[in-house]
A protein has these predicted regions:
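A short alpha-helical element within helix-turn-helix/winged-helix DNA-binding domains
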Residues: 28-39
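Alpha-helical residues within the helix-turn-helix
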Residues: 36, 53-54
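Minor-groove-contacting beta-hairpin "wing" of winged helix-turn-helix DNA-binding domains
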Residues: 64-71
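Conserved segment of winged-helix/HTH DNA-binding domains
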Residues: 74-98
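C-terminal regulatory/oligomerization modules of transcriptional regulators
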Residues: 95-143
Length: 143
């Protein structure tokens, strides 16, 4: 798979910001604190937060008392929202199609591989869109 750990980091950041702001009455949370508490390197934290801000999942405030807050309730944010924020425009599968073999059979196989892998990506996105971040607190364990 071609994705980074940014999805899980983005989810962790949003959950941490939610928990912190619920407990501390909407105080902005600094990137440094988020980085330290979640053990994510500062440059990575900055990049993920920038992507979350660009997707309007968080709002940022500059300055000494700055940091980030959620831009909307956690119950309105899906895992797909976070995925699209932190992995913008990336395909799930990188497909090798530059082969020496040629012919209709080869082209048909390539098309089928691409079709099925694109279907798998769509299925994953459909699955993620049904999971709200608040569901992560209340999910039943499946055996």
């Amino acid at each position: 798979m071609a994705y980074s750990t940014a999805l899980s980091q983005g989810i962790s950041i949003l959950l941490y910001v939610h928990a912190y702001t619920e407990k501390n009455c909407l105080n902005y949370l600094s990137t440094k604190v988020i980085s330290e508490q979640l053990n994510i390197p500062v440059p990575t934290t900055v990049k993920v937060i920038r992507n979350l801000n660009n997707a309007k999942l968080t709002v940022a405030k500059e300055g000494a008392k700055g940091g980030i807050l959620l831009a909307q309730p956690l119950s309105e944010i899906t895992m797909l929202d976070v995925f699209l924020a932190v992995e913008p425009g990336k395909d799930l599968f990188k497909i090798h199609t530059d082969v020496t073999l040629q012919g209709q059979d080869v082209d048909d196989v390539k098309e089928k591989v691409i079709h099925h892998l694109e279907g798998a990506e769509i299925a994953m996105q459909n699955y993620l869109k049904d999971i709200r971040l608040t569901d992560l607190f209340h999910e039943e364990k499946k055996g």
